[in-house]
Structure formats: C-alpha cells, structure tokens
C-alpha cells in the first residue's frame, strides 16, 4: 500500500496509507463521530467537496450495501453518488461481513474515484479541527509518478498532486452540484 499524506492549510501533515482510489484531492476537512452509517454519510450531499474524517476506529467492517432502490430512491444511500472528496480513517477494514454487503468500502471508493487514507490518529486530528475549526486540506500520494497523481473527484480531474491547491468548496455553487437535473 503506498503511503499518503493529509496536508492541512496550516502546514500540519498526517501520514498514513492509501485505500480506495490512489489520487490527490483537496477540500474542506471536517469530521463525523458516528459509529455506523459511513455509506449514508459519504453520499450525503451536505458533505459535497469535503474531506471527511471518521473518528470511529474501524471503518468498512460491514462493507457497502447494494445501491438499488425503487422509484429512483436509493434504499441505503442519501444520493446517487459519493459526495465527499476523500476519506480519512484510523483503520480501513478490507474483510467485511454483513448480509446486505455487496463490496468492500475500498472497492466502492475506487469505483467512484475517491481517495482515502488509513492509519491516521483520527481522534487527534479531530481534536485539532475542533479547536482550530474546519480547515482546507489535501490528500497527496507518495511514490506515484506525477502523471498518475490525478484528482480524486471529477471536479478535480487532471490536477497534479504536488500542484493541488487548497480548494475551498464553499466558493462554488454546491447546491447546483448536488441538485437533480430533472424531476
């Protein structure tokens, strides 16, 4: 597993290992302290453009359920796609077990081109964010050739890792990005 870093706007760096898509991305770094519901949280439009830190120590242990539903409503998700820019966890579990699971968290993130970092002390990071407030951050992958350091979400495709700026999602029209195009 390649090494990765979360670099905060204040210069702080947190090192870990990649999972999901191996690419660079940036966004506002926020945290969630929930014990369950990572698929719902990751697809929640209110997290659009953000790098999400999950404080529960083991994420991915129940996998990701099927995304099918009825009448264009998803039974296990909050929207039709992952909304976050990246995911930061203490430990990403590859061996999942749940009757409704269809795939691992890492596989799902790869399908949606979302990078993640595991092996980070998410509770220390959360304390920093709680005392300093949310900050802009970026995920960069060590050891990948520059041409492979593409952005983690379609809004950032083609950005070279070391050149990824601290993107503030609040400067964009997020409502337009998450709204349905037609009824």
Regions found by a protein language model. Name each.
Residues 1-183:
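RNA-binding accessory domains that recognize and position tRNA/RNA substrates
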């Amino acid at each position: 597993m390649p090494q990765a870093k979360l670099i905060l706007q204040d210069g702080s760096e947190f090192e870990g290992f990649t999972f999901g898509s191996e690419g660079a991305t940036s966004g506002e770094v926020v945290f969630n302290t929930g014990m369950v519901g990572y698929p719902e949280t990751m697809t929640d439009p209110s997290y659009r453009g953000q790098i999400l830190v999950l404080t529960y120590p083991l994420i991915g242990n129940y996998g990701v359920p099927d995304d099918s539903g009825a009448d264009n409503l998803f039974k296990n998700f909050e929207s039709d796609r992952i909304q976050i820019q990246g995911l930061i966890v203490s430990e990403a579990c590859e061996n999942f077990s749940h009757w409704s699971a269809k795939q691992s968290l890492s596989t799902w993130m790869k399908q949606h081109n979302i990078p993640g970092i595991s092996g980070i002390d998410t509770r220390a990071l959360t304390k920093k964010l709680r005392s300093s407030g949310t900050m802009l951050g970026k995920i960069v992958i060590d050891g990948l050739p520059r041409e492979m350091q593409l952005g983690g979400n379609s809004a950032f495709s083609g950005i070279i890792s070391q050149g990824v700026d601290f993107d503030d999602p609040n400067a964009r029209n997020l409502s337009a990005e998450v709204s349905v195009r037609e009824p």
